[in-house]
Every structure is written in C-alpha cells, then in structure tokens.
A protein has these predicted regions:
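Preference for extracellular/luminal or secreted protein segments
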Residues: 1-139
Length: 139
C-alpha cells in the first residue's frame, strides 16, 4: 500500500487535469462522415440550434466512464457550445425537443448515480409542443 504521505491527495484536482490536451485529443478523434451542402465548417457567427434533453447533463458527458469520473469536472454540450459560439459572435438556441422516456421506473434507473441531482427529468409538456419548440429553435 505504501506510505500515506506518498499518496496523491486528489487525482481529480484542477491542477492535475490537462484540459488543453484532452480537448486536442477530442478534436483529433472526431470523424466527419458526410459534409452535405458544404455545411461545415460553420461560420464563426453562425446561429446554432441545440436540441436534446441531455444538453445540460454533466454525468452523461462522461458516458460509460461516469463511474471513474467526476461530473463536476465535465463541460456539458450546451455550456461548451455556448462558450465557443458566444466568443465568436454567434448564437446558440436551445430546445429540449423530447423526454428520454415516459416510463418513471426507467427515469429512476437512469438517475441512480446522481439521485441527489437528477439529470434525467420529465417535461410535462406534450411531445408535439416540445417538437414545435425544437423546430422553431432550428429556424
């Protein structure tokens, strides 16, 4: 086990995380499958619609690594896009679009790791209303 003094105090401290390197790896690992109508790259001043119920869910940014990571260190898709778009004069519009499921037992299961701050929540609005909101955000 070793001497307690030799143990690192906090392996997830901000001082130990190499965010620039992690972002570089993420950038290099993305694959563009098809660029229809030469959509990409987006203009720096583009208006972007982000649609999805997990856009602000830090634990879901970790994916299957959620048991080994700390969601407080995760940057959500919405926060990351908002920062990138705002600094370049663009605009990000968000719409939920849908619920993940209508089954309460599934919602409880999906929140078992973060029961104190659930990320999978139910929007009481009708599906048609959420879809209409998403379509409006994309226009």
């Amino acid at each position: 086990m070793g001497v307690a003094k030799a143990d690192r105090a906090d392996l997830n401290a901000d001082s130990r995380l190499d965010r620039p390197a992690a972002r570089d790896v993420a950038r290099k690992s993305m694959v563009l499958l098809e660029n229809r109508n030469r959509t990409l790259p987006l203009a720096k001043t583009a208006a972007i619609a982000l649609v999805g119920p997990l856009a602000d869910a830090p634990i879901d940014m970790l994916g299957s690594w959620s048991a080994a990571g700390y969601s407080k260190n995760a940057v959500t898709l919405r926060a990351g896009l908002n920062t990138a778009v705002a600094k370049n004069g663009g605009r990000l519009t968000y719409a939920r679009g849908a619920n993940i499921t209508n089954d309460e037992s599934t919602v409880k299961y999906l929140n078992f790791l973060n029961w104190d701050t659930p990320e999978v929540t139910q929007d009481p609005r009708a599906p048609a209303e959420m879809i209409a909101e998403a379509v409006k955000a994309a226009q």
